[in-house]
């Protein structure tokens, strides 16, 4: 009994256990773009080298079931300064005109929810070579007690490149080398990484005055040509020198026209002049021509530093700077400071009092202040002092100090700021001192401590200030660190104490501080108050949309949960079915008392009539949000299996092919059992589709279903639609496009013949060591001027669309030239193999057709297995060649050119299979019809089912 059970368990197919054919994702990165070099010697460090501005194409080839989703990400490379990430959800990553900053490591992440994701990477190295920059530096040193001077010249050549460039120095047309003579030295400076080379000319001699060329090269990597730069060294070579037509600080009035000239006083070669402005660009309307800068009708915003720079690549650039100051007065403020020694915050007779006045002026130190009392100039005395630049106040501030305040000191004080002799208008500020002048207080109006508004509405926060004079109110956030006000400022001034917001958002909720300013009022400790802003916003729910599947007759529970909202509670929940209002479901008393955070609807048994769209509208008295449920007993979509090995079976003689379509059913137990599938097949660019019904038995999770599509035309592609059907009706459809691909010749498949219909020619490659290549063609692609009386008119099938491989022996081919076509590498798993193929050898100059076996067991060894020479007639003939490889091997078709141009040789329909060759030649005109499949096959299901019945009968 135990033995029988063990046998039964062993016969159960693997895919029927656990997850079936579900498999975790696997990935491999291949390149398909304009790569220069792809180094793959070290698998852990694959490097893809590409030239800048070329097109990068990387493909992530994935396997696994269900079909994995692919995501590309990138980390920084050598040419990038910081981490970067870009996500591309596609199996092919394509970057047009790649830049050097896009180099780095690219990761392909494939995941399908089974197991762990597969992650592969490749490093992209972007190659480039910029134009070199050559600068000249000179030093002069005294030698032997000032009897004569030695002049040394350094020619510094710098270039940005990847890989590091090689430098070649030339004097005229002669190449210079390190220590070529006592006057030449070539070296790399410290703290450089190969991007700089210096040519040092010591104790300059007459022959050193010449033309010098710095040539940089990356050794033609990626086809990047060399670049060079030339400099003519003479005895007059000198760095630039400058002088300005104005002083370095230029003060002007607004509205004036400003002209500054930057004059060259030296430099050979002739330097180039350039004007710049900091901060920002030159003002609008400014004109820089050579060394002349003109600014018409200058304004205060045009103030700043203007730089004139001269460069001629000799020495350091010469630079002169003009600080342009346009006179202006703005932002007049005052401060009332009670007696600081007595730490008083009020004005009291008998104590000191200070009045301060400040304006923002350009230039600040040139502003002049005047004080007036009751309209008359204030006269200084022992009790009235006027000071400037108080260290406790902003720079260039004027203060009027009243010592031992008397009643007679009460009055109106006026501070006037001006630029004497300038058309800039004066700026003044007035301060009233009396017994009613009191420090400020601040408070929040009654009922305004908490402001509640809806999101998107305007809001107004208010603080009331009392006192004389009333200072401005400053607003800031309290509860959030580094949080900004709605205006984007950290601190905002309001003259009336009201902070206004046009449209509030939920992020603006929180506590706001209002405080008195210490200017335009008393210079005392700031008074503060706080206002709470509460923003109500509609609820957010989950799921916003959910697909609910259940078998007919089973119960269904729908739940709509509140994620967030203000207020955070459900005030009401309304359910609708297909737009019709449903009676409210019962609510538990506990949930009603606490305020529920979700709404539920229960269906006792799902029926066709109760299938459809359900909506739950949740409200919190501010707004509402909706959960949408699509409830049905529809079957989920099939999951196509993309990892079928060699799904294409071609039948060359009938010009048809078949395709093995495989799939699994997603979550088959979630709904009623699948009864059958409806298959729709449509040839691309055609309108008519063929529909077939595919009956199935009980489908298990992970079970691989299979159906063979027959009578497909080579080389057309087809669109496939597959729909499952249950007792409920049609389920979700899955679609894909299948393409005809020539199967790769594999010895494990006896019916796998290479017909050369696909451009990939079954993985065959041209040998790089031969004289010329095999050519793939058919009757439609033949050269109309081809040589007559040689070569086949069509392939073995006799149709003009069929392809074959041949050698063209016309000029410039010569006697004995060889063309070799090499198969993929096969792993030997049998002792004997048979190579079958058709050949066509017609023409009076036919050479030889050889079949070789390349063994890769210990090294590489080519062995002749078959050979044929001479004219064999204008017919296709078949050959069967037995081979006995001792290890991994390849087969090679070698065509040898004969004595003339009438010697074209062709091959077609190559088959490699295990076992001995047939004793009788197959009729080449016989058409073999491959068997189609009219019903799906449940892989291995029928086999182990029959075996189980047999074992049970045996046990009895």
UniProtKB/Swiss-Prot annotation:
Gene: Mdga1
Chief location of this protein within or outside the cell: membrane
PROSITE patterns: FN3, IG_LIKE, MAM_2
Lipidation (GPI-anchor amidated serine): 933
Organism of origin: Rattus norvegicus
Segments of skewed composition (Polar residues): 780-789
Subunit-level organization: Interacts heterophilically through its MAM domain with proteins in axon-rich regions and through its Ig-like domains with proteins in differentiating muscle. Interacts (through the Ig-like domains) with NLGN2.
Domain Ig-like: 24-123, 132-230, 240-323, 338-432, 440-534, 539-632
A GO CC term assigned to this protein in UniProt: GABA-ergic synapse
Keywords carried by this UniProt record: Cell membrane, Developmental protein, Differentiation, Disulfide bond, Glycoprotein, GPI-anchor, Immunoglobulin domain, Lipoprotein, Membrane, Neurogenesis, Repeat, Signal
Protein name listed in UniProt: MAM domain-containing glycosylphosphatidylinositol anchor protein 1
